[in-house]
Amino acid sequence: MRVFLRFKLYSGILFSILTSSPIMGQSEYKIFGHRGCRGVYPENTIEGFKKAIEFGVDGIELDVVVNKNQELVISHESYIDTSYCLTNKIDNESLNIYKMNISEIQDIDCGSKFVKEFPNQLKVKEKKPTYKEFKKELIDYQGDILFEIKCDYDLVNEYFPDYEKYAKIIFEETRFSRHFDNIYFMSFDYRILNELFKIMPNSKYIYLSSNKEFEKQMKLLNFEPFGVGIDFNIISQKIIDLVHNKKQVIYGWTINDEENSKSLTSMGLDGVITDYPNIIKK
């Protein structure tokens, strides 16, 4: 009997030590391919998303803007960025996606140009896809989608639709999608999240910030979001604990080296958003 009690005592102590350690006690985290996997393939493209999925990501991150025909276009910028797209035009005004139809947008090659930031990125002719094309090409995809909505209050009606119209476009293009339940709507602009929440109160929302004062910014939201996405450079144990105490998740962007990934996930970071899902592994 004494042996059995002693065994139970030792087992309990061992279990307590193991589960209280930073690594054994942390919850499972997720890895997301940033704009697909732009470290190795042109960003925000159908093939880029497929490559990220091949690398085994838990989810993919993409960005959306709106074109002249009120369609969602997958693009990080609201204009054709000449730093990675091939065009003779140099002014953003003439390359404003909000004033271009889809054929004009997709006539421009956004994959063949050398990108200094990503020297190993495959150079191949690519186009900016619509969200409708994404839904069709990845219809069987069942992972998470970090759906970043690009917006800027100072550029509304010039580069972006007004918030109410923007929210309705997003609602119409996503609500019947097979991916809908896996979408996390994200933005740096609290206004578009508030507008979306009015018509999709049961969806998941993530507030994005690159500011340590993100808590103050979040007070402008009319609801409690599912979580926050923060520049990894300002994430600390204190910030992770603060977010977790609110029963929210915290994702870090953009983490491209294993050292930072391991360090932050050992603190309890819930998600790693990376350009290199071929390198950053669990």
Model regions and ranges:
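Phosphate-group recognition and catalysis centered on beta-loop-alpha active-site segments
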Residues: 22-282
